[in-house]
Amino acid sequence: MEKFQGYLEFDGARQQSFLYPLFFREYIYVLAYDHGLNRLNRNRSILFENVDYEKKYSSLIVKRLILRMYEQNRLIIPTKDLNQNYFFGHTSLFYYQMISVLFAVIVEISFSLRLGSSFEGKQLKKSYNSQSIHSIFPFLEDELSHFNYVLDVVIPYPIHLEILVQTLRYRVKDASSLHFFRFCLYEYCNWKDFSIKKKSILNPRFFLFLYNSHVCEYESIFFFLRKRSSHLRSTSYEVLFERILFYGKIQHFLKVFVKNFPAILGLLKDPLIHYVRYHGRCILATKDTPLLMNKWKYYFVNLWQCYFSVWFQSQKVTINQLSKDNLEFLGYLSSLRLNPLVVRSQMLENSYLIDNVRIKLDSKIPISSIIGSLAKDKFCNVLGHPISKAVWTDSSDSDILNRFVRISRNISHYYSGSSKKKNLYRIKYILRLCCVKTLARKHKSTVRAFLKRLGSGLLEEFLTGEDQVLSLIFPRSYYASKRLYRVRIWYLDILYLNDLVNHE
């Protein structure tokens, strides 16, 4: 982050007060389109289409845009002329796209610098890669086994543009930047009413910035969750992009609420609270009673409706009892499972059998929703019976095989932490048989005849890749005993949800 701070050329006091002049500096555009900062779009190409301006960027275009920004009237273009009005060879929409990227980057760096300073003096938990989605589950396994209720909250989106502008006012004191931000935001809403190509939409970085600033303001309300907490934060610069938040055990904050929030002190009798937020949802785990959990629920509803002026239905907050209900989180179904243990104790000539029960977090694959996603993509029918992928029959055999193998390995990689591998093997079976049926359909043959001609070597492609990786991680004796197939493995290189999870 130190290297980004040099680009701003401001000290801490001026940094939040004078952001508008940065729109007229060429080196900021270089930073915005730098390979490192633009990594997000390439990594998430499966979700967002690359827009044209990434390929057309040049210093000449930047100079033309800055020249146009000095003349304010030239930025205001009627919406009907948005794609027809050209300025130095580019449409007005193209320049608005560049401005949206620049605005997001400038404010992101400013936010991140202040966010980093807010962690000073805090106790940071060590983690090899806290950006990984799988790093959440070991945390939940260690902590949720001690709790009985979880509050599952779907974070609402603001329905009015002024709410976003108002949220940004708390953090950006530069009036010129706020007016410019409001202008670009309203211009974009005018474009949505007209026929504009999907790839011409504003940069996803801009919308991620809007969403994260909204969530950041919401989480700042719960300062008591951060007053005396330990943080596990991301290790890279993309701290504002869907940042994983971990708040550990909260203690010694009752005095704060006696002074500031005496009316809701009854909600906070239990000082042990865990909060996790990722991908538009958050969970709050406590040891509270059902009555107090309902109070938490309506507190969330009133918070959004009264403080943030967002219509928020109570159905968006669900109370899950972990011993009875399944918690659907990040593509897994999690619940508490009682694991009985019998321990024999020998004392002199007498022996005793001691029954012990260990509570364990059980994470399973939601097989019905995964099969529904596979059926929607035409890999199988709604009952889970594999069918041929007709749209891929025009590709080469190697291309078809590589596609299926890649999908199978990605699913195995993401759901390697499942406690029941039977459902995972069923999904892999569907993909393997779908691959064979697709190849047989291409060659106008039956599945039996096609497999007889090629042998079993075709299906081994689905197994070798994952087995080779696991054989390097675990010792040979452990791998040979086949106990590996019953062990849950959490990988620390998974940064995004699997496509089948995102399908809904």
Swiss-Prot record:
Q: Name one GO biological process term.
A: mRNA processing
Membrane-traversing stretches: none
List the GO cellular component terms.
chloroplast
MF-aspect GO terms: RNA binding
Keyword Membrane present in the record's keywords: the answer is no
Question: Which key words tag this protein in UniProt?
Answer: Chloroplast, mRNA processing, Plastid, RNA-binding, tRNA processing
Q: What does this protein do?
A: Usually encoded in the trnK tRNA gene intron. Probably assists in splicing its own and other chloroplast group II introns.
What does the similarity note say?
Belongs to the intron maturase 2 family. MatK subfamily.
Query: PANTHER family of this UniProt entry?
Result: MATURASE K
Name listed for the protein in its UniProt record: Maturase K
Organism of derivation:
Barbarea verna
